[in-house]
């Protein structure tokens, strides 16, 4: 006998158990009866496509957590295992048909209606797939979109619940629906916590009501509730609650007043109606501890001001009065020497709200202009394909004007082709003539240019005199040097660039962003507002140091674009804050390179609905401003402010070293101020050993700010390491002017800017301006 026949009742019970495991996440996501999601759970065979030569049959299947999609592969390495799955939370969008660069080149080899592309956030490559039927492709597209929308609309508490249940399934190694003590220890390792052995056993025994040495479904839930208790949050609740059990509307109103929010009874009642889960409490207008936790973890209580999540600033000012989200070498996927040129980075940048993208244009074969990093090993992409991509995605994330920064190295003939392609593809979106025939006194506003695409480039019959008008002059202050500063060819190439003629057709399309070299501020003041000058980072820093006031005044009426040094061959970035301090509008960064500089950029453009335009402080918009970014001991914008932040705790920080199951993070938190030089500062908490699940610091840091309007606040969490460099865990950056006071949660982001949900920091923020502080209710009745 090879094996014992299972009892039919046992088989039926196991079948129901498996079914219920799948139904739980379906029910929580509200997709229990969704036929598209049910198809995904069954799995489908389809073709994975990378090129015309690389096409492999794969089976894709949605796993039981209803968030993870598994792609069958014969590879067995740990890295490949990670790449075999993706979470719908990592998906930026799903594109139907042959919309990717790869699939567009294969329309004669694959049926377009059977294809779709999964585009991920961050640096992960897109996934091109071809199903056997059109219906199957449509159902997978709908299914992924449905799950993506449902997960993004979950409350923070629901996300935590879903997160912990996913780990429970992984920890239940024999999949019997119960957990032994060893499986519980495995769970603790998975969720990044190293509990004291005695405490873990005590907690296990406390929850083991059946006393059989294994936790069933109900007991596991109790164990998780105990694990996820937030004593620091409970303390805040008890402080405001008269009886320690519920908050009345009056008590909740007092709490809201201390938070610096709308402290009305109407607002307090609306929060109870929204976040209270208990029917009796909701009916009687009480908020229980669970309801309070739901509220505290919600976006309503986020550290970032929710009023700033939509366009709230005046968009009728001249373009020069705004910071403009700008990308450098937009076409590159990685470094400036060997990486691929592609349309994908344009899509990513535009979807992030970028409003100025760069096109490095060169003569291509067969009369077709191309885009690549000249005289390097980077691959090439057709100019036409890039413009088609821009036409499709230009205004998906923002309705405000998009600027195309042309680095023009093409012959007159191919420039004419560029002009024709720009007009035929972009159509009415392309601004080809001024909005008014009247002489230009100031640049038009983002509101006036809504939905329009502007060209930044050289112009004939411009400002350099008629005898010079047929030449596209190039110098280090106006155009980026070719090939990132290749010395062997730079003299020859620059000489050739200096005599490159400009096509009248292309010149005519340049309206409000005419590129001119910098010839001093006296000359700049005599030029119209429609000119723009590009500076390398080093040139800009020198101007800020030597002529800061003049630079600020110039930037109040004309646009300036700052680009990274040619020596940054790995596409690294400079600190954009110094340029923003001087009022520079277009501080172009390598969007393909994550890091602190891109964190700052994301934080700078987080407010105003992430539309890519943020109004500069008034003292940077005044043509007679006396503001000097290098000397900020007083003067315009000077508002002495004390910022005090208490870093209380963190929740659900992820494991960093996933290759080592026993590795648990030792987190510490940095709080950084990025602003004018006198305000720049950082402070850190102590580290907490072996606890990424619910570390607690209760550490207070304080900063003295002189120009709060220019300051960014960055929270960064890292894994402390004695032997090597600390590992980055997550961060969140926002303008000081968008920072909310009181008890707040900081929802952390990954290095690529995507969400690290459900990881959060719990903090308390206090702001005192000009030495005057109005005491909160808590401070009047006693310290919390």
From Swiss-Prot:
Its EC number is 3.1.4.11. Its cofactor is Ca(2+). Binds 5 Ca(2+) ions per subunit. Two of the Ca(2+) ions are bound to the C2 domain. Ca(2+) 1 binds at residues 172, 174, 176, 178, 183. Residues 48-78 are annotated as: Substrate binding. The active site is at 328, 373. GO terms for cellular component: cleavage furrow; cytoplasm; plasma membrane. SUPFAM superfamilies: C2 domain (Calcium/lipid-binding domain, CaLB), EF-hand, PH domain-like, PLC-like phosphodiesterases. PROSITE patterns: C2 (PS50004), EF_HAND_1 (PS00018), EF_HAND_2 (PS50222), PH_DOMAIN (PS50003), PIPLC_X_DOMAIN (PS50007), PIPLC_Y_DOMAIN (PS50008). Residues 506-621 form the PI-PLC Y-box domain. One of its GO terms (biological process) is lipid catabolic process. Keywords: Calcium, Cytoplasm, Hydrolase, Lipid degradation, Lipid metabolism, Membrane, Metal-binding, Phosphoprotein, Repeat, Transducer. Residues 159-194, 195-230, 227-262 form the EF-hand domain. Ca(2+) 5 binds at residues 719, 721. GO terms for molecular function: calcium ion binding; phosphatidylinositol-4,5-bisphosphate phospholipase C activity. Ca(2+) 2 binds at residues 208, 210, 212, 214, 219. Residues 38-149 form the PH domain. PANTHER family: 1-PHOSPHATIDYLINOSITOL 4,5-BISPHOSPHATE PHOSPHODIESTERASE DELTA-3, PHOSPHOINOSITIDE-SPECIFIC PHOSPHOLIPASE C FAMILY PROTEIN. Hydrolyzes the phosphatidylinositol 4,5-bisphosphate (PIP2) to generate 2 second messenger molecules diacylglycerol (DAG) and inositol 1,4,5-trisphosphate (IP3). DAG mediates the activation of protein kinase C (PKC), while IP3 releases Ca(2+) from intracellular stores. This is 1-phosphatidylinositol 4,5-bisphosphate phosphodiesterase delta-3-A.
